[in-house]
Amino acid sequence: MANATAARTAAASATADIPILGTSITAYGVALDLDDFDGTVGGNISGTSDLADLSQQADMITEWFPEAKKVALLFCSAEPNSNYQVQEVATCLANKGIETKEFAFTDSNDVASMTQSAADYADVVYLPTDNIAASNTEAIANILVPAGVPAICGEEGICSGCGVATLSISYYDLGVTTGKMAAKILTGEADISTMPIEYTDATPKYNPTICEELGIQPLDGYEAIEG
């Protein structure tokens, strides 16, 4: 079992025969550079994904902020999974007639400058599931909140630090699902080469602290992120 993309990459480099189950991997097709990815990796790799539905994330932006005309896509250019997410969300928003612009940082050193540029441009910021963003939520919040610019986020950890709302994946449930997949392989019930990547349901959640600071009334159907 390999937790996250780096561990999955290392495991795949070490063996082509032993079954490898990845977990907390956002986009397998991107991580494995599969142009024809159809939901099943094949070979000795399968697993679970922490990706929440991207079209639903785009819908969240228009549901929470129906007057928004410009959305800044704030992400790390060095993370292929992040780039995949923002491209998909940008397409969904374009179909809604909303203008988007990418603000990509390369590492933690330019998070603040890119966030400031995003805040100057946008009505709303979108942050995908992104490792660098997750490590810099305080810096991001310190710019967006005073500027009065809300953020919709790809996962709960980022949202709890700097966002208004998210579709939250339970990493506990993701681990349980991965464990069940492992059991099927070990008992001979399933062949990893034909096992599709599995997902877990996402829960709409909001950040009560940032909503209060920005004067935003939470929408019905969203759970508060606990302190």
Placement of each model-derived feature along the sequence:
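Glycine-rich, charge-decorated loop segments at or immediately adjacent to ligand/cofactor-binding or catalytic sites
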Residues: 31-38, 111-114, 159-168
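An alpha-beta-alpha
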Residues: 46-94, 194-211
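Hydrophobic alpha-helical segments within soluble ligand-binding/sensing domains
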Residues: 28-69, 169-190
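Hinge/beta->alpha junction and helix N-cap segments in small-molecule ligand-binding domains
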Residues: 48-55, 75-85, 102-111, 131, ...
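Beta-alpha junction/loop-to-helix N-cap segments that form part of ligand/metal-binding clefts
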Residues: 1-35, 130-154
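Pocket-lining segment of extracytoplasmic ligand-binding domains
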Residues: 80-149, 155
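Hinge/cleft segment of the Venus flytrap/periplasmic-binding protein
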Residues: 184-227
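Periplasmic-binding protein-like
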Residues: 145-165, 203
